[in-house]
């Protein structure tokens, strides 16, 4: 199972934080910092992309009889330019399959954004999350075909654009003007003007 997907830059600024296992917010931040410390100190030329998890972060103190043990958790990452794409998985997942999944994720983002960069992920976070949701849901991999992933995300983007254009048409009508005036507190002024 995939427990978390983290994307952060070389300054430990998160660009995506998605947990599929319940983890308290303070522990999420601590986990991100510890994963960053572990990864940033590694020499990617001589060391693998596989790590063991920081101690006791995925287990809450109240939930000691949870089936997840830290010895079963791995951190698998890949560095692209200024970003680290990191998956936190249990030992049931193949390390090489997760590395391939990271590659699929990045290729899908490249196709959606045409040469993805960090700013694309910041300003188009909805597309970033949509791509991830097409690949992983509930901690399980559901799609690995880049063409299908991109087609699904394109459909979502087209649906969002058509919804936005319908909202734009609504605001140009009298009803839309009424809603806009009412929201701004000038409903009486609008009503007398009609």
Curated annotation (Swiss-Prot):
Any GO BP: protein targeting to vacuole
Highest taxon listed in the record's lineage: Eukaryota
Main location: Golgi
Its membrane topology: Peripheral membrane protein
Keyword line: Cytoplasmic vesicle, Golgi apparatus, Membrane, Protein transport, Transport
Compartments reported by the entry: Golgi apparatus; Cytoplasmic vesicle membrane
GO annotations of cellular component type: AP-3 adaptor complex; cytoplasmic vesicle membrane; Golgi apparatus; intracellular membrane-bounded organelle
SUPFAM superfamilies recorded: SNARE-like (SSF64356)
Xref: Gene3D superfamilies: 3.30.450.60
Pfam families the UniProt entry points to: Clat_adaptor_s
Miscellaneous comment: Present with 1240 molecules/cell in log phase SD medium.
Subunit: Adaptor protein complex 3 (AP-3) is a heterotetramer composed of 2 large adaptins (APL5 and APL6), a medium adaptin (APM3) and a small adaptin (APS3).
Function: Part of the AP-3 complex, an adaptor-related complex which is not clathrin-associated. The complex is associated with the Golgi region as well as more peripheral structures. It facilitates the budding of vesicles from the Golgi membrane and may be directly involved in trafficking to the vacuole. Required for the transport via the ALP pathway, which directs the transport of the cargo proteins PHO8 and VAM3 to the vacuole.
Protein name: AP-3 complex subunit sigma
Source organism per UniProt: Saccharomyces cerevisiae (strain ATCC 204508 / S288c)
